[in-house]
Amino acid sequence: HDHLGHGKSLPEGAVPVYFGDGATWETVVDDIHLLHQRLREQYPRLPILLMGHSMGSFLSRTYLIRYPGTVDAAIIMGTGWQPEMTIRGGLLLAGAIARIKGPDAASKLVTNMAFGAYNKAFGDKPRTPNDWLSADTDNVDRYMADPMCGAEATVGLFRQMLRGLRFNQTPGNIDRMDKNAPILLIAGQSDPVGDMGAG
């Protein structure tokens, strides 16, 4: 499943890594739910498992809060937790840039603040700017060669993602998840998103 503004779901000529004008984090979560409903209709006897990785892990966590009891199990891969001050600062910066350049503008500053520190764990001279994505260099090279990967995220997407992180981390929201659904939380031991396996 491609998220809105990503992969093959991106209309020709559209801005990549941008959910779309007026689209919110909740719009993307509702899109996941629409796919879920279609799968339930097409395969009513099969269990449905939700798996999300990286940004998809954050969207999946929002989904589990907003639509408890709709999936049979979930796998949350490469997820993390951000301090409120980090979220607040990111929202202020991305909001300021969006007011000047528009929400569909990409920002090297915001991208570097969001992902730049991830590569620092891999030495002073990483092989690529994306070494943090995988311990397997072939995976990193395939990612960098794929025209559907690696576009700079827009400030509009960053704002929505930060709002999603804040929503996910709100204790009252966490309590809304289905406590009987099996959920596997998993992260690589060198994954900076998951604090090097610490979560």
Residues covered by each model-derived region:
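Conserved alpha/beta-hydrolase
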Residues: H1-G13
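Alpha/beta-hydrolase active-site loop
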Residues: G20-R40
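Alpha/beta-hydrolase fold nucleophile elbow
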Residues: Y43-S54
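Glycine-rich nucleophile elbow surrounding the catalytic serine of serine-hydrolase chemistry
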Residues: G52-T62
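Alpha/beta-hydrolase-fold enzymes
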Residues: S60-M148
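Acidic catalytic loop of the alpha/beta-hydrolase fold
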Residues: G150, Q189-G199
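Active-site nucleophile elbow and catalytic-triad environment of alpha/beta-hydrolase enzymes
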Residues: A153-D175
